Amino acid sequence: MKKFKVIDQYKLKNFMIEMFLALGFNKKHARIESEVLLWANLRGIDSHGVRRLPLYESWVNEGEMRPNAKIKILRESAATTLIDADKALGPVAMDFLMRIVIQKAKNVGVSWGVIRNNTHEGAFGYYVSEITNHGMVGIASAGGMPNMAMYGGASAGLSNSPFAIGVPNEDDFPLVLDMATSVV
């Protein structure tokens, strides 16, 4: 039987923050990324938790993820926002946009946001759960480069298209569906 080592969640979060700081990210961005990774681990979504650290480190070293990224609003209306993430940490760009979308939805009743040049966002359930804390329904989805084969195929032809929806309810525990069209 395989034995697992249990690590205190606060120690794990602090370890992740220190790792992101060592890679050159600022404290706020290191905290946001670490919270999203920890959220996934605490819910058994280990594919989107701390095990991603070596991959993120390689992306930073290869220039695919930028510690000094400058997120910019490219276009917006009363209900929509388009941002360029400049290869920031995915959760940092998602958090930036999520806060804008929530405020616009409070102002006009609905809002939509789109991110260009983003990196791995982590578990989408995190973001829709945060939106439900404001009494709103949250929907998140993404497209990407082909990373899975079509039925009967031998090579990648489709994106796994992650999708999540969060619906608030009276019991403080929202209904959250977080899925993709592949197994991770």
What are these regions (language model features)?
Residues 1-23:
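Generic N-terminal amphipathic, Lys/Arg-enriched alpha-helix
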Residues 8-11, 26-51, 65-76:
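N-terminal glycine-rich anion-binding loops that anchor highly charged ligand groups
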Residues 38, 91-92, 96-116, 128:
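Alpha/propeptide regions of enzymes that mature by internal proteolysis
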Residues 73-76, 105-107, 132, 155-159, ...:
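Solvent-exposed alpha-helices and their adjacent loops that cap or buttress functional pockets
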Residues 83-85, 106, 112-117, 138-142, ...:
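General beta-strand structural signal in soluble alpha/beta enzymes
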Residues 148-184:
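Phosphate/diphosphate-binding glycine-rich loops and adjacent basic-rich segments that engage nucleotide
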Residues 49-102:
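Active-site cofactor/substrate anionic-group-binding motifs, chiefly glycine-
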